[in-house]
Amino acid sequence: MRDLLPPATGVWNYVEDAARRVFRSYNYHEIRTPVLEETQLFARGVGEETDIVTKEMYTFEDRDGSSLTLRPEATASVIRAYIEHRLDQRPGVQKLYYIGPMFRRERPQKGRYRQFFQIGAEAIGSESPFLDAEVIEMVVELFRAIRLEGFKLLLNSVGCPECRKAFSAKLREELAKVAPSLCADCRRRAETNPLRVLDCKVPEDQPIIDALPSILDHLCEGCRTHFDAVQRYLTDRAIEFEIRPRLVRGLDYYTRTTFEVVHGALGAQNSVMGGGRYDGLAEALGSKIHSPGIGFSIGEDRLVMSLEESRKAEFTPELDVFIAPLGEPALRECAIVARELRRSGLAVEIAPEGRLKRAMELANKLAARFALIVGEDEIAS
């Protein structure tokens, strides 16, 4: 966990302001959910066997005996709010976005922190592959808006529960042959949730995983048609992507489309955004109404790092006007002038002391665009 201080926070504001503009252009509206949720929400939504639930959540018992957890991700919370507040009764697809802190007890590494920030969006109420393409387009537009270059979009389909069931059986059969050569986590996953083996990041396991069957060869007709349509709609938008059959993401709720954006500035763990479709999540959380959805989350810490390391933006704080008053009467007059300038949208600083040389040195250090010197003659005129 860490503090974020100026001028670094200028980068964060730049990214968040751009995200809000892009989301608004696609008719998304902000949702704010609690940082604390009942633990069972994430166990049911994210998946009992996922690393997030088994290893990474900050969970504690409240005074009344209930189990609470600092949210490790936001999608489950958004769907809970969607169900609880009957947002399915509102017209059209519900398009929601969020910006805020999440918490996971992860192993510290480059760009990953135990309190981290996510920017994300969820579109709930449609199974259309056109919506999948629109959501992915929105991500690409955001990255273009902040002038992030060198990113790559990865795409896959993990199928529906039916075709995934057949694939899991085949995968479990193949994993039984190679499991002794895999890491301890993969050996455990091979028994509990074989699809998760494909999400392994251990370098030594990759040649074995690459030789495993591909889920794209086991999609049912409906999932194949859906995935083909997503690719077609992305191509119509001139959005470049790369098919990655091993892209399953680390959460159990995903169905059909999964996608990820990677950036070379981050090294081996190079993901800055991940998302996918979750057509059964609402029902898993207790909804009696089928509410298919798709969404994504951007790791803001890692995105900011990518921006800074690619040197595509300078984020020094902008001071428009520095005012240097000479004497007490000028200081009092400058307070009124500064107020009017601030009301017009300018960033203004008034020198706290009356020494001109020191004031000009400070104006230079603050990189002010303009310096205004006010003395008795200026007041008189």
Regions found by a protein language model. Name each.
Residues 1-381:
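TRNA-recognition modules of translation machinery and tRNA-sensing kinases, especially anticodon-binding
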